[in-house]
Amino acid sequence: ASEGSDTVRETDPGSRKRVVTLIGIGMGTPAGMTAEAAGAVAASDLLIGAGRMLEAVGNPGRPVYQDYDAQRIADYIRTHPEYVRPAVLLSGDIGFYSGAKKLYEALEQVDCEVRSICGISSVVYLCGKLHLSWEDVCLKSTHGRKANLVGAVRSHEKTFAILSGGDSVGQLCRELQEYGLSHVRLSVG
């Protein structure tokens, strides 16, 4: 490949270096992906990710492996050397409570180069839509973990939280009201 190029060219199949690209797909729509992310998806020979990520980018005629577990993904890549440009699709920006953290560790066991392409962060996206700067935002996540959101809201002028599914927004509203914080402005996106 030429310098600065993300394309791997096969000259000698025995000497090709596998390149695994971790791609943050942003908000989960093709329009919300960066051009770099879309280009890496197009250049890949295998798409890997949770079902929602695979659906978000589409897969015209391309093999897919649906999974979100870092070790299983690394094992699949290791045991399928026919794929030299697999792309692992991750939500958001690959830095805020992302599966990329465990993937970096798991891929150390695979003979490959790992590249990262950041997507648009949900905090950046939502704050932009709300016309708010985000340098003073307290960042929290209850997606698969516990966090004291009431304490964060009480202690910070701006708190951004990634919530779990279901009734997590309703539950947060009830907790805020219960702790005397019914006056706070809540934006959901």
Language-model features, listed with the residues they occupy:
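Hydrophobic side chains in well-ordered alpha-helices
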Residues: 76, 99, 126, 149, ...
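Short hydrophobic/aromatic-enriched beta-strand-loop microsegments
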Residues: 63-69, 111-115, 134-141, 181-188
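Generic secondary-structure signature for well-ordered alpha-helical cores
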Residues: 46-49, 82, 131-135, 174-182
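Short, glycine-/small-residue-rich phosphate/pyrophosphate-handling segment
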Residues: 122-155, 164-165
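Short beta->alpha connector loops
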Residues: 27-30, 68-71, 142-146, 165-168
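Class I S-adenosyl-L-methionine
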Residues: 1-120, 124
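A contiguous loop/helix-start segment that scaffolds small-molecule binding in enzyme catalytic cores
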Residues: 1-22, 84-86, 155-189
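Glycine- and other small-residue-rich loops at beta-strand/loop junctions that grip anionic moieties
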Residues: 92, 115, 141-142, 161
